[in-house]
From Swiss-Prot:
Residue ranges, compositional bias (Basic residues): 128-141, 988-1002
Chain positions found as Phosphothreonine: T1259, T1264
Record carries keyword Hydrolase: yes
Motif (DEAH box): 524-527
Name the record gives this protein: Chromodomain helicase hrp1
Length: 1373
């Protein structure tokens, strides 16, 4: 039984009605309410079968009272009638009804038009395609409907207006949550079955709430009950925002999704009421709430504006429908709408769609050149560039790109930030289309934050080209590929000219995008390609492109290696750039290299500076404001230094470098705000009232920078300035956002967590005329790239970036073309902290770009190392100003009495007009600003910096903490034992209740710190299990202060959890080499623990350590056949593999740099980690990735054969048991690289296998082999017998444990392999070798005259597994 429906009468309802007719009647704009003359009728153009006047009732604001009423004329959607109570409203007493629809089950096949909107001959106008007609489905009538209309069951709403006319609007969308018949041709043969399925679906359909957008109070409401006194604006599933309706709670309570209404009431109405009734709430807070609500309402109105028409289609009735993309919504929210309705709303978008469908600039209509035409300079701005007037230097940039294209060369557009690189690039693409008939497709890859700016530039400067923004989720991108890429579903002819996308979607959809041949590739912020080993670099390098352009304002950021990567991407193999130039000790040869490089690069890099080409741009000045730390900051700073004393005074190799870097990051956080550490804010608020004033005071007074910022913003606000605040740390932006709210400052925010659509709204809102926004909070990396915020004239760098170029990019957001005011930049700096030294070192980096790009290097130029900070530099940074932290100060008093004028008067002024690159002439003045006095912090010792009493205090705290932990764990252990004992006696009452157990478990979990687990995990995957290498792992993980029992427990639990995860997912077969995703688990709150790595590598490393037990790893050689390497740029054999294993055992898996630098291993010239990669031919192997693969393979061999090592001695004459038999008596030859020639050996009989095994059993009659007793005594005296006993004992053990899982070796397996090695190393004579091998065999009771060999071949492919390799020789014992 269906619920009742009531008609909603619009005659007396106060609504903004859009009355539109296609024959020239008046049109009321749905947004602004102004009446204008409508455009001419589209009936003749679209060749509709029926012309009709349409009227639509649309909401002009979020508070519009318009209703949408469902019609039943020839439709397939069953309108679920809902019993609706009367609304006791003075203005309207009619019933309110809910309208819900489902998406179309018809295929979304676009009908493409090949005609233009204007001046088209009648015979050229194609008739829209019609679907094959189907029998009309059975109609269901709504019960208790006043007019007893037959509601449309296909996919329509009927909007009844006051005049009685009706507009039919398609309600299909692109999402398929119901049955969807995607291929119409397939189902044409099964119409009867389709009708039956549709009818079944229709009977089950009911309206579903998608979102609750807004609420309003009823005029006749007597109280504030959210369920009886309010109406709610509902967005329905599968339809656009055009069909949003206002509904009562009682009406919605019977609709699917009504819980969303309850959630909305809690999160909005009740929360809003609590805020307004709170006595501590200020007027500014209420104003902020109202502004935010209004902003959301404006955004909802944006969702009703047509942004683009994607496709068109003709339904069964001959009516045209448009697939519409709505403004600010992604492609997965596109819906099918009636063409006449859309034309009345957005005639310009319809015109643009028809123009695109029959564009003269379709890619397949372009011209193909066998040879590039000669270059002709553009003397003035072409007529087809109509977006505005380009400047002379921009026209020069277009000519430069055109010159490179005619020569079939690529380049780097490296103009300083703010000079319009985006406009130049877009105009050049327009030049290719209009002047050279190169219609694309063109690919533009940009950062996500710059997408809105690029979209705006493309729409403004190239409106006649078809540009697509390829972003969004998987469904959105699928819609783009289906409707926007090709002219038809069966055609591979592209219909777009420009595709705009981001780095992330290049990686996600590289398969689809790489199938297209691109005429031009432009990459914005191209310094993302500075790492030639990154996935983005490799993916874009494989794209098929005719020409490429890199766009970056900072072509050099750190070192020459990054420049080499960019140049190699553009011109593979054409340039070789040395990245090891030392600027500290320049010489004549290096100067010649630099000048030669500059001359060679000059034609391919175009760089102009603002001061040289844009004289009208206002100036920019930078001031460094130094401020003291607060008392809370000082205390945290000292504690971090003191508690990390071991790391500060420990090793300064690669492992220590990471620890020091972590300390530097922690100190940078302290320099910003102590609230960045968990629990700091709560600790300060203890004993204080949780009032608004106390919260605000804590945020300000506990950070010196916040005190300065508070005073500075008050003055800037008073003087009418607008401010951009940049910080590296997103959590710092959270604190700043809370401060802005408490102060009542209107602000916007942009960081890496903000979606693209919200970013665009925030930027537009800030740049809008008369915008109320005072501050824009931005992260340095996400907000410092490519966006235009020139409506602000003040920039505050709250904390400096490691890379000075990132800060310059941030400043350029305001200092760019279009800026009308002088730009002030304030850089905050905490005194006597690591920030000061980092800033000074960062400044020196910029000389590198100055030298290469602008002036070249002279003997007077100075520069520090351009590589990343090493351990010594990090140690010097940490020591800078550290001693002042332990001196008594009155910083807090200074902060409370801070005088802003005094701070500004003593600020360090820095003229930033000579930013990166310096002046194009005369660089001496530029170089002088980098001449800084080095602070010789390395002369100090940490014992001199940190007072002894501080060390004693910290050590006492650590001892107390360790004792407390041990006591807690002992108590828990006893309770656990009691619980286990209690389980044996069910009648005994437990002393602990379930609640107490839960609390105890919570306390245990709280004690497990994430840092400890991560450090332990990293150490274990380097060295193995804690049980075997406790001291090494504890030292590596820096857990000396942690209770050993705790370390053992964590290690065992981690291994157990990983084993269970691998076994649970069916990945416990270690021999399976098929590619699969990593098994990542969460262990005690720590995520991304690789279970397979722990299960395999950690245990393999333990096997390796056990194999070396009692032996000198440097004197061991692999005595087992292993596969050889291929295409490595060095001689690599068994000796190198043996040393690699020894290095892994000594330094840890993955520590390739330490292994390379170890002189005892002799691998310095065989491992290539830092070699330049200018082209494929010069890439040296092995690199780190090859060593990882080789190391894992060798560890798997150790796992299979733990006795594979044999002793290597320096005196061959003493190795009587290691000589190789002459070639005549043995056809096997083993070389140092591991390759083995064919050999012959008779198969071993089953009986003799059992005899050998039985001999092993006799060694240990109890069933276990006492390997220590058997092997220890004769290890050095009689090596052959030791080997025999070891292997036979192992065979006996394997027989009892894994009898059929592993093949064992006899003594001769090892002896033959050793003999093969010795023959190659010592070049023994065949006769001498044969005698000694015969002697060894006779001692072991083996036959000398019967070699017993069989054919044996080893695979040497890279994917060969250990299990594929047969044993070397299996002789009879």
């Amino acid at each position: 039984m269906e619920p009742e429906h009531s008609n909603y009468d619009l005659k007396n309802h106060p609504t903004s009605v859009q009355e539109s007719t296609l024959n020239g009647s008046a049109v009321t704009d749905p947004q602004f309410g102004n009446t204008t003359n409508s455009l001419p009728s589209m009936n003749g153009l679209l060749n509709h079968e029926n012309s009709f006047a349409s009227q639509q009732s649309l909401s002009s604001s979020a508070f519009d009272d318009s209703e949408i009423v469902t019609s039943t004329a020839n439709s397939t959607v069953v309108s679920s009638a809902l019993s609706t109570p009367k609304i006791d409203d003075a203005q309207n007493s009619d019933d309110v009804r809910v309208d819900g629809t489902r998406r179309s089950s018809r295929a979304k096949r676009p009908v493409y038009r090949d005609f233009s909107y204007t001046e088209i001959d009648e015979h050229e106008i194609p008739i829209p395609k019609k679907r094959k007609s189907k029998p009309a489905p059975k109609q269901k009538k709504s019960v208790a409907s006043d007019d007893e209309d037959a509601y449309d069951k296909r996919h329509r709403f009927s909007i009844n207006s006051a005049s009685g006319t009706e507009i039919r609007t398609s309600l299909r969308s692109s999402k398929g949550k119901s049955v969807n018949y995607n291929e119409q041709e397939f189902y044409d043969d099964f119409e009867d079955e389709e009708e039956e399925v549709e009818e079944q679906v229709e009977e089950e359909y009911e309206p579903i709430i998608d979102f609750v957008l807004n609420h309003r109070k009823r005029a006749d409401a007597q109280d504030d009950d959210p369920k009886s006194s309010y109406q709610y604006l509902i967005k329905w599933q599968e339809v656009s925002h055009l069909h949003n309706t206002w509904e009562d709670y009682s009406t919605l309570s019977s609709v699917r999704g009504y819980k969303k209404v309850d959630n909305y009431i809690k999160q909005n109405i009740i929360y809003d009421r609590e805020i307004r009734e709170d006595p501590t709430t200020t007027f500014e807070d209420i104003e902020a709430l109202d502004i935010e609500r209004e902003r959301k309402n404006m955004l909802f109105e944006e969702y009703k504006i047509v942004e683009r028409i994607v496709a068109s289609e003709t339904n069964e009735e001959g009516k045209t429908e448009y697939f519409v993309k709505w403004r600010q919504l992604p492609y997965d929210n596109c819906t099918w709408e009636d063409a006449d309705v859309i034309y009345s709303m957005a005639p310009n978008e319809v015109y643009q769609f028809l123009q695109r469908e029959n564009s003269p600039y379709l890619p397949y209509k372009g011209v193909f050149y066998n040879t590039r035409p000669p270059y002709r300079k553009l003397e003035k701005q072409p007529s087809y560039i109509k977006g505005g007037e380009i400047r002379d230097f921009q026209l020069t940039g277009i000519n430069w790109m055109a010159y490179l294209w005619h020569r079939n060369e690529n380049g780097i557009l490296a103009d300083e930030m703010g000079l319009g690189k985006t406009v130049q690039t877009v105009c050049f693409l327009s030049y290719l289309v209009h002047s050279l008939k190169q219609h694309g497709p063109f690919l533009i890859v940009v950062p996500l934050s710059t997408v809105p700016a690029w979209q705006e530039t493309l729409a403004n400067w190239t409106p006649d080209l078809n540009s697509i923004c390829y972003t969004g989720n998987t469904e959105s991108r699928a819609n783009i590929r289906e409707y926007e890429f090709y002219l038809s579903t069966n055609s591979r002819k592209l219909k777009f000219n420009i595709l705009l996308t981001t780095y992330e979607y290049i990686l996600k959809d590289k398969q689809e995008l790489n199938n297209i041949r691109w005429q031009y590739l432009a990459i914005d912020e191209a310094h993302r390609l500075k790492n030639s080993e990154s996935s983005l670099y490799e993916t874009l390098s494989q794209f098929r492109t005719a020409n490429r352009l890199l766009i970056t304002g900072t072509p050099l950021q750190n070192n020459l290696k990054e420049l080499a990567s960019l140049v190699n991407f553009l011109m593979p193999g054409k340039f070789y750039i040395r990245d090891e130039l030392n600027f500290d000790q320049p010489n004549a040869e290096q100067e010649r290299d630099i000048r030669d490089l500059q001359e060679r690069l000059q034609p391919f890099i175009l760089r102009r500076l603002k001061k040289d080409v844009e004289k009208s741009l206002p100036s920019k000045s930078e001031r460094i404001l130094r401020v003291e730390l607060s008392d809370m900051q000082t205390e945290w700073y000292k504690n971090i230094l003191t508690k990390n004393y071991r790391a500060l005074t420990g090793h300064t190799d690669g492992r220590g470098q990471l620890s020091l870097l972590n300390i530097v990051v922690e100190l940078k956080k302290v320099s910003n705000h102590p609230y960045l550490f968990p629990g700091a804010a709560e600790k300060w608020m203890m004993g204080r009232k949780m009032t608004r004033e106390d919260t605000l005071r804590g945020i300000i007074m506990n950070s010196g920078k916040m005190v300065l910022l508070d005073k500075l913003l008050q003055r800037l606000k008073h003087d009418g300035h607008r401010v951009l605040i940049f910080s590296q740390m997103v959590r710092m932006l959270n604190i700043l956002g809370e401060y802005m709210s408490l102060r009542g400052y209107n602000y916007q925010r942009l960081d890496g967590t903000i979606p693209a659509s919200v970013r665009r709204v925030s930027i537009d809102h800030f740049n809008a005329p008369d915008s109320p926004d005072f501050v824009f909070l931005l992260s340095t990396r996400a907000g410092g790239l490519g966006i235009n915020l020139n409506t602000a004239d003040t920039v505050i760098i709250f904390d400096s970036d490691w890379n000075p170029q990132a800060d310059l990019q941030a400043m350029a957001r305001a200092h760019r073309i279009g800026q009308k005011n002088h730009v002030n930049v304030y850089r905050f700096l905490s005194k006597d902290t690591v920030e000061e030294d980092i800033l000074e070192r960062a400044r020196r980096k910029m000389i590198l770009e100055y030298a290469i790009i602008s002036l070249g290097v002279t003997e007077k130029s100075k520069n520090s190392k351009n590589d990343k900070y090493d351990a010594q530099e990090l140690s010097a940074i940490l020591k800078f100003g550290a001693s002042n932290m332990f001196k008594a100060t009155e910083n807090q008093k200074k902060l409370e009495n801070m005088n802003l004028d005094d701070i500004l008067s003593h600020a360090e002024d820095r003229d930033s007009s000579n930013d990166v690159g310096g002046a194009s002439m005369g660089g001496e003045e530029f170089l002088k600003q980098f001449e800084v006095t080095d602070y010789k912090a390395e002369d100090l010792n940490w014992d001199d910096i940190i007072p002894e009493e501080e060390m004693e205090r910290i050590e006492e705290e650590e001892r107390m903490l360790a004792a407390q932990r041990a006591k807690e764990e002992e108590r828990e252990r006893r309770e656990e034992e009691e619980r286990e004992n209690d389980e044996d006696h069910p009648s005994r009452t437990y002393k602990r209740t379930t609640k107490s157990i839960t609390k105890r478990q919570q306390r245990r979990e709280e004690m497990v710190r994430e840092k400890e687990i991560r450090l332990l995990y990293r150490a274990m995957i380097k060295f193995g299990l804690v049980d075997e290498r406790f001291d090494t792992i504890v030292k590596e993980a820096e857990l000396q202060a942690t209770d050993p029992k705790r370390i053992y427990s964590l290690s065992a639990d981690m291994v157990k959890a990983c084993d269970e995860a691998v076994e649970r997912l069916g990945a416990d077969d270690t021999k399976n080499k098929q590619p699969r995703k990593a098994i990542l688990i969460e262990f005690k709150g720590v995520k991304n623990i690789n279970a397979e790595t722990v299960t395999l590598r950690v245990k393999d490393l333990t096997h390796l350590h056990r194999a070396y037990k009692g032996l000198d790893p440097l004197k061991q050689i692999i005595g087992y056949p292993i596969r050889s390497v291929h295409s490595w740029n060095c001689s690599w054999g068994i000796k190198e593999d043996s040393m690699l294993l020894a290095g892994i055992n000594k330094h840890g898996f993955g520590c390739w740099q330490a292994i390379k630098n170890d002189p005892d291993l002799g691998l310095h010239d065989k491992i290539f980690l830092d070699e330049a990669k200018n082209d494929k031919e010069s890439r040296y192997v092995p690199s780190a990735v090859h060593l990882v693969r080789r190391g894992e393979y060798l560890l798997s061999v150790v796992r299979e054969h733990p006795d594979l090592f044999v002793v290597k001695t320096d005196q061959p004459t003493k190795r009587k048991y290691n000589r190789k038999a002459p070639t005549k008596s043995s056809t096997r030859q083993t070389t140092l690289d591991g390759s083995i020639s064919n050999t012959k050996k008779s198969s071993r009989t089953k009986k003799k296998k059992e005899e050998e095994t039985n001999r092993g059993d006799e060694t240990s009659p109890e069933g276990t082999v006492g390997e220590d007793e058997v092997e220890e005594e004769p290890r050095q005296a009689e090596p052959p017998k030791r080997a025999l006993r070891s292997n036979s004992g192992k065979a006996a053990s394997n027989k009892r444990t894994t009898r059929n899982s592993m093949k064992t070796h006899s003594a001769m397996d090892t002896l033959t392999a050793v003999a093969a090695l010795d023959a190659e190393l010592d070049n023994m004579s065949n006769e001498k070798a044969k005698e000694e091998v015969d002697h060894v065999k006779s001692e072991n009771g083996e036959s000398v005259n019967e070699p017993n060999t069989e054919d044996l071949s080893l695979e040497t492919e890279e994917n060969t597994t250990v299990s594929d390799i047969s044993p070397l020789v299996k002789n009879e014992a």
